[in-house]
């Protein structure tokens, strides 16, 4: 590798930058470019029918501005625009956006594609970066600026031929991120001089990181510099269009909003040229996780992610931020333990505050059952969580510790994730809940003189004992019968589910001589469960 081949992108000096001190308090104006920027990055571009399916999904999610394509680029793009308009598929509160280069015949064709539309954004652009000026177009700064001005005039002129529609004009200095910021301001100012926008009738100035060429903080500097040096800033909506070449498209967009941008263009799940466009899902959920309404309905990824995958033929990574299959799953034992404890303490009326889970998975229609999965990396908490969530077994800590090696052995033998059923079956087998070593035929329990008096019939034999409670009375009965002392170290019991027909489960931890044993039993009532659990340890 030869790093000396490269030079850093020059960005403006901004010693008094204000964006680091700002906080986001509301969602930006969203503009989906899935149907254009996303589509042009596909090896097999979408058909009209696929575009219509994606269009319906974008509308359902709540986008109010949707770039539908480059109608002058191909007949398919043109036909798609016509179908949306002629079949009345565009809701009254949704504005379509179209892309066009600053060339007259393309602009004319674009307006033909939009004839009869209620409202639309006409997005005209030309490149302004140094490398494009000098090596691609071989044009001077003055030439490029003149191209932008002429394009703006054509956009305005052809709009006047279609007064039945409401038009919004948008201009992009393509490769803004690699353009001298002063020059980008100069060109955009010249475009505004043509359009003469007002605070009540604003134009859109879109600032693309067509190729991400610097760190997010420096791109934010470019955006803040641009905004603070633009005349009539109140007459322009400042839009951001970032790409992910350095892996920072979302961060760059987020910091640009702090720098004063109003609007963000991107795609769902980040599909786009090279490494992709800015992922609107990630940015929207970032806002959501801080208590800001993203104004997009992303609550059921299992319904809309498959649509994106179907039309793009791109699978979503299991670790994709917020919506990947594995992002709310913990395998690490310490993580599982922290999650389990936090979920036990989390109250419905309190702000969400759970370790390792930045949002409540239920907000994205994910179940708690899928959060913790047991494998060889899991500790006692993972198995305990699964047994609690799936089978209503609230294991005491001493049962968790005792069962953990069993779960570990199963996971190592399985060589991967242990299914919930495998874990439950192992629990039943390990604590012999599938076998009755002692049959409880009957019992009588009474209280006299501050003591519990127990008469219990086991395998046809009657035992009697007394004590401070049921368990101590049974231990006394056992000692009277065998001469062996049994000490109850701990115990726990609970109903297996809500309702009058619920069974009970009891856990007892006992010591006989130097041996400690755990007994567990399920029964129709708590006392029966406690007796059978203790019997399972002393027989």
Swiss-Prot record:
Gene3D superfamilies attached to this UniProt entry: 3.30.160.270, Aldolase class I
Broad class of where this protein is predominantly found: cytoplasm
Superkingdom assignment: Bacteria
Residues where Mg(2+) binds: 37, 241, 243, 277
Swiss-Prot/TrEMBL catalytic activity: 3-methyl-2-oxobutanoate + acetyl-CoA + H2O = (2S)-2-isopropylmalate + CoA + H(+)
Keyword annotations of the record: Amino-acid biosynthesis, Branched-chain amino acid biosynthesis, Cytoplasm, Leucine biosynthesis, Magnesium, Metal-binding, Transferase
SMART domains cross-referenced by the UniProt entry: LeuA_dimer (SM00917)
UniProt record, GO biological process: L-leucine biosynthetic process
Pfam family, one: IPMS_D2
Record's GO cellular component terms: cytoplasm
Annotated Pyruvate carboxyltransferase domain residues: 28-302
Single annotated GO MF: acetyl-CoA C-acetyltransferase activity
Entry annotated with the keyword Magnesium: yes
Disulfide bond residue pairs: none
Pathway the protein takes part in: Amino-acid biosynthesis; L-leucine biosynthesis; L-leucine from 3-methyl-2-oxobutanoate: step 1/4
Enzyme Commission number, as recorded: 2.3.3.13
Top EC category: transferase
Subunit structure: Homodimer.
General function of this protein: Catalyzes the condensation of the acetyl group of acetyl-CoA with 3-methyl-2-oxobutanoate (2-ketoisovalerate) to form 3-carboxy-3-hydroxy-4-methylpentanoate (2-isopropylmalate).
Family in the record: Belongs to the alpha-IPM synthase/homocitrate synthase family. LeuA type 2 subfamily.
Record protein name field: 2-isopropylmalate synthase
UniProt source species: Hydrogenovibrio crunogenus (strain DSM 25203 / XCL-2) (Thiomicrospira crunogena)
């Amino acid at each position: 590798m030869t790093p000396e081949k490269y030079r850093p992108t020059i960005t403006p000096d901004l010693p008094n930058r204000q964006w680091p001190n700002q906080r986001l308090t509301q969602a930006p104006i969203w503009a989906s470019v899935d149907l254009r920027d996303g589509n042009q990055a596909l090896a097999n571009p979408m058909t009209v029918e696929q575009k219509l399916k994606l269009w319906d999904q974008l509308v359902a999610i709540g986008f109010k501005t949707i770039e539908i394509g480059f109608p002058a680029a191909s007949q398919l793009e043109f036909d798609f625009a016509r179908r949306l308009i002629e079949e009345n598929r565009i809701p009254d509160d949704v504005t379509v956006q179209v892309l066009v280069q600053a060339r007259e015949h393309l602009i004319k064709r674009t307006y033909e594609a939009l004839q009869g539309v209620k409202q639309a954004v006409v997005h005209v652009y030309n490149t302004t970066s140094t490398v494009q000026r000098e090596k691609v177009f071989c044009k001077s700064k003055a030439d490029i600026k003149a191209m932008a001005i002429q394009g703006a005039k054509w956009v305005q002129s052809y709009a006047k031929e279609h007064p039945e529609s409401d038009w919004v004009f948008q201009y992009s200095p393509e490769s803004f991120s690699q353009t001298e910021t002063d020059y980008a301001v100069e060109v955009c100012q010249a475009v505004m001089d043509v359009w003469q926008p007002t605070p009540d009738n604003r134009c859109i100035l879109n600032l693309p990181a067509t190729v991400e060429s610097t760190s997010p903080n420096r791109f934010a500097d470019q955006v803040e510099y641009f905004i603070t040096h633009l005349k009539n800033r109140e007459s322009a909506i400042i839009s951001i269009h970032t790409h992910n070449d350095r892996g920072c498209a979302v961060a760059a967009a987020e910091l640009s909003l702090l720098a004063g941008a109003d609007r963000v263009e991107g795609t769902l799940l980040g599909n786009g040229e090279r490494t992709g466009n800015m992922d609107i899902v990630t940015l929207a959920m970032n806002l959501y996780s801080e208590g800001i309404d993203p104004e997009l309905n992303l609550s059921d990824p299992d319904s809309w992610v498959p649509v994106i995958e179907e039309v793009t033929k791109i699978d979503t990574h299991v670790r994709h931020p917020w919506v990947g299959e594995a992002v709310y799953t913990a395998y690490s034992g310490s993580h599982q333990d922290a999650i389990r404890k936090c979920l036990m303490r989390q109250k419905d009326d309190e702000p969400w505050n759970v370790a390792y889970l930045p949002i409540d998975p239920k907000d994205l229609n994910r179940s708690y059952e899928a959060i913790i999965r047991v494998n060889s990396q899991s500790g006692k908490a993972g198995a305990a969580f699964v047994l609690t969530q799936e089978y209503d077994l609230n294991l005491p800590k001493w049962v968790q510790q005792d069962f953990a090696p069993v779960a570990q052995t199963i996971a190592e033998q399985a060589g991967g994730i242990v299914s919930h059923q495998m874990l439950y079956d192992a629990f039943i087998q390990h604590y012999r809940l599938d076998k009755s070593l002692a049959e409880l035929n009957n019992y009588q329990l009474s209280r006299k003189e501050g003591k519990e008096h127990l008469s219990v019939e086991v395998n046809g034999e009657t035992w009697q004992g007394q004590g401070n409670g049921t368990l101590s009375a049974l231990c006394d009965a056992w000692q009277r019968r065998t001469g062996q002392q049994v000490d109850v170290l701990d115990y726990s019991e609970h109903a297996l589910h809500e309702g009058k027909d619920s069974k009970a489960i009891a856990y007892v931890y006992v010591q006989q001589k130097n041996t400690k044993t755990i007994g567990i039993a399920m029964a129709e009532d708590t006392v029966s469960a406690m007796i059978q659990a203790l019997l399972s340890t002393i027989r």
